[in-house]
Amino acid sequence: MRLLVYNIRYAVGAGMSPQLPVPGAGYLFGNPGTLDNIIEFVKSCRPDVVGLLEVDVGSVRSGGVNQAEAIAGSLGHFSCYECKYGEESLNQVLPILRKQANAFLAAPHILGERFHYFDTGIKRLVIELELDGVVIFLVHLSLKYRHRQFQLRHLYELVSRARKPVIVAGDFNTFWGENEMFLFMKAAGLRSANTGRVPSYPSRIPRLELDFILYGAGIEITGFDVP
């Protein structure tokens, strides 16, 4: 199985864009050509499963285009997605923000998906995807250290209930890299696929290891790459 994890930043591109005055709200103006480039890149990776972060699922910024469904359609994949904010968050009803989501794309052998929510932070969504031989959790953790620690505790509880081998992937916003993840990984019995601690952020000149693919017992890693 080939897993691709990609924060597409609502397909606004890497240039400077005006930002909404709400933490984590993303960007206001779209860039029509960027989504096509993202689709071509994702297709070139030939993934079996894709975890997408910061996806626009149909706001005015994307011209009403559901980016998760557009990418899934190009791959012939199933898609599941949900707004990344808490169920009672005001962001769930605000224009643009309510269309900001995370998503899984996968071939049609999905057994089920579940949406969980952290108790703290602005970005609270955890997507759980169950396949034949593995359970994958997709996360985007808080920018605040204290909130991240509470979120990691909650994530440990979700992982510990899984009855299949586990993968936990996403943008952890860990400004101290794997050192910040050490206790969570030990408690959950997880290891990083990024054994060389290759940085992933910012994309043009990566300096920080913010993104992780963690795996548990019963899973063998045959390759890892940060494009």
What are these regions (language model features)?
Residues 1-74, 81-89:
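N-terminal, active-site-proximal structural segment of metallo-dependent hydrolase catalytic domains
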Residues 2-7, 37-62, 136-139, 155-183, ...:
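Active-site beta-strand/loop signature of hydrolases that rely on acidic residues for catalysis
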Residues 5, 102-104, 126-128, 138, ...:
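Conserved hydrophobic/aromatic beta-strand scaffold that supports enzyme active sites
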Residues 8-11, 56-58, 86-87, 108-111, ...:
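Short, solvent-exposed loop/turn segments at secondary-structure junctions
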Residues 13-19, 64-65, 91-94, 126, ...:
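Short aromatic-enriched loop/helix-cap "lid" or pocket-rim segments at secondary-structure transitions
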Residues 25-31, 115-117, 142-147:
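Short, flexible loop segments at the rims of nucleotide/cofactor-binding pockets, characterized by
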Residues 54-133, 225-227:
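Structured beta-strand-rich core segments of catalytic domains in phosphoester-bond hydrolases
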Residues 110, 114-117, 130, 147, ...:
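Metal-dependent phosphoester-hydrolase catalytic domains
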